[in-house]
Amino acid sequence: MDNQGVIYSDLNLPPNPKRQQRKPKGNKSSILATEQEITYAELNLQKASQDFQENDKTYHCKDLPSAPEKLIVGILGIICLILMASVVTIVVIPSTLIQRHNNSSLNTRTQKARHCGHCPEEWITYSNSCYYIGKERRTWEESLLACTSKNSGLLSIDNEEEMKFLSIISPSSWIGVFRNSSHHPWVTINGLAFKHEIKDSDNAELNCAVLQVNGLKSAQCGSSIIYHCKHKL
């Protein structure tokens, strides 16, 4: 539209007053007048073109942001980055802590389940109890200490059914029953009276009990016999 306006103004330039006063004198005068008009039109066209370029430069310069505006834009950009970093910190860190807490709680529950509801590896389960079936031969006192180190006790008998089950697993093993002498009753390692019958109890040197296939028998406490451990769930 601006170019059209410039061309329009050039085409409608007012005639030169000097040229209006002059009267054409023949062909030579007409040619001179025409040349003057062309020269005048070219000068006006160049001037209009220069004005248009200057206006265009001024228009573009107005669109460019000034130094204070650039500073404000930079500050706003920094503030936005800080806010985004804060949001990420607020969202990510708590979720990470919650996940770690959940994992820790899960591990704790798993450990409790293994301790309370399941037997350790290489142990067998029977009637809510865990049993360690040993292969080493030790004295009664050494067997007692070995089971204590495993957070359990030397094998104990609660009923006849359990006795039959254990006698099938092992032909002979120490149990947690003893007496101070042949004149004292048989007691468990917890100090409770033992109710089941033990054979050969008249021998004064046999003050520790052994589980065998055919029942319970007394034996010398210093003998080397296989031991088993028991841990109740």
Curated annotation (Swiss-Prot):
Region Disordered: start-end pairs: 1-30
Membrane-spanning segments: 71-93
UniProt topological domain (Cytoplasmic) ranges: 1-70
PROSITE patterns attached to this UniProt entry: C_TYPE_LECTIN_2
GO annotation, biological process: adaptive immune response; CD8-positive, gamma-delta intraepithelial T cell differentiation; innate immune response; natural killer cell inhibitory signaling pathway; negative regulation of natural killer cell mediated cytotoxicity; negative regulation of T cell mediated cytotoxicity; positive regulation of natural killer cell mediated cytotoxicity; stimulatory C-type lectin receptor signaling pathway
Pfam families: Lectin_C
Motif Immunoreceptor tyrosine-based inhibition motif (ITIM) per UniProt: ranges: 6-11, 38-43
InterPro entries xrefs: C-type_lectin-like, C-type_lectin-like/link_sf, CTDL_fold, NKG2/CD94_NK_receptors, NKR-like_CTLD
Result, substituting I79L: In allele NKG2-A*03
Listed SUPFAM superfamilies: C-type lectin-like
Known role: Immune inhibitory receptor involved in self-nonself discrimination. In complex with KLRD1 on cytotoxic and regulatory lymphocyte subsets, recognizes non-classical major histocompatibility (MHC) class Ib molecule MHC-E loaded with self-peptides derived from the signal sequence of classical MHC class Ia molecules. Enables cytotoxic cells to monitor the expression of MHC class I molecules in healthy cells and to tolerate self.
Protein name: NKG2-A/NKG2-B type II integral membrane protein
Protein species of origin: Pan troglodytes
Gene: KLRC1
